[in-house]
Amino acid sequence: MSTVVKDTHHEEHPSGIMRWITTTNHKDIGTLYLWFAMIMFFIGGLMALVIRSELFQPGLQFVDPQFFNSMTTMHALVMIFGVVMPAFTGLANWMIPIMIGGPDMALPRMNNYSFWIMPFAFSMLLSTLFMDGGAPAGGWTLYPPLSLQTGDAFPFLIFAIHFMGLSSIMGAINIVATILNMR
């Protein structure tokens, strides 16, 4: 009786969209971070245009005060957690392994996971614009009177901020671990 032996090849890498979803390559993840930062920069820029168009002249021109405050809150969160931190992390993913002579980041799976938390967090954050009562209007400090924050939007905002912070902390841990352990 003859037996056919089938070799399993683990060298095959996914292609297409699965390459980007499952990658642990630091340059691919850095590219994903930079593209995400650019997309969020344009979304935050549109929010800034709404804010600036309202401030063009005294009085009400385009939006009511609640929506203006919502835009201020959302613009701050998008620009800090959606542009600045992902752009720095994306550049770090590209530059740090090259600068220290390492083959990759120290924790590549956590690197991938910390990136993929962000699209879900920002989906939650931006979905508050379409909920009853509109997006939370906490201003730059996120310290509004809680009696004014009704509906589901504020809990979604807080949950999204937790996810954005988790993603940022995981990216920072990966950067520090790479610098300390791989140099």
Each model region followed by its residue ranges:
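...captures the hydrophobic TM-helix bundle architecture rather than a specific catalytic motif
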Residues: 1-183
